[in-house]
From Swiss-Prot:
This is Transmembrane regulatory protein ToxS. Residues 1-2 are cytoplasmic. Keywords: Cell membrane, Membrane, Transmembrane, Transmembrane helix. The lineage of its organism: Bacteria, Pseudomonadati, Pseudomonadota, Gammaproteobacteria, Vibrionales. Interacts with the C-terminal periplasmic domain of ToxR, possibly by binding and stabilizing spontaneously forming ToxR dimers. GO terms for cellular component: plasma membrane.
Length: 171
């Protein structure tokens, strides 16, 4: 009789623990912190904007690597390649970003605290003011809250509340 009661309590405990684990943010946090994640984004600008805003910018390629640490910190390094209209040359901005992260109700909340421009080259196609504006847009995008879905162990889908999705992947 005691063995049956103990077995029943153990079974209920296992079911409850499994439900708690799979239904909580813990699984998402484990997947998020288990690897370094990469993403690639290409933006094409088709609107004719005044040259004084972003200059002759017509395409942006952003490749980034991010590591979410178990202590709630994150580190991201982004390589931003800017392509001007009518030019095959590219201008590159490298940005290192640090901050805090947390998962709440399957939303990834990111709070950047430090940005460093680690670029070494100067741009011929863009003025300093235009590069500052482009960098500021990148910084604003970093502060988004995104819904996080685990597609599989190598792929995460981050869906923004206002504009599109980002896929994080690992090799």
């Amino acid at each position: 009789m005691k063995i049956k009661v103990a077995s029943a309590v153990l079974a209920v405990s296992i079911l409850f623990s499994g439900w708690l684990y799979w239904g909580s943010d813990l699984k998402v946090e484990q997947v998020l912190t288990s690897n370094e994640w990469q993403s690639t984004m290409v933006t094409v600008i088709t609107d004719n904007l005044p040259d004084d805003t972003v200059g002759p910018l017509r395409r942006v390629n952003v490749e980034s690597n991010v590591k979410y640490l178990p202590n709630g910190d994150y580190i991201r390094v982004a390589n931003i390649k800017l392509f001007a209209q009518g030019s095959t040359a590219e201008s590159t901005i490298n940005i290192s970003e640090k901050g805090r992260w947390e998962v709440s109700d399957n939303y990834l909340l990111v709070s950047p605290s430090e940005f460093k421009d680690i670029s070494s080259s100067q741009s011929k196609d863009f003025s300093e003011a235009q590069l500052r504006l482009i960098t500021q847009i990148f910084k604003l995008d970093a502060e988004q809250s995104r819904r996080i879905d685990v597609v599989n162990e190598k792929t995460l889908l981050l869906t923004s509340l206002n504009h599109g999705s980002t896929v994080l992947f690992r090799n």
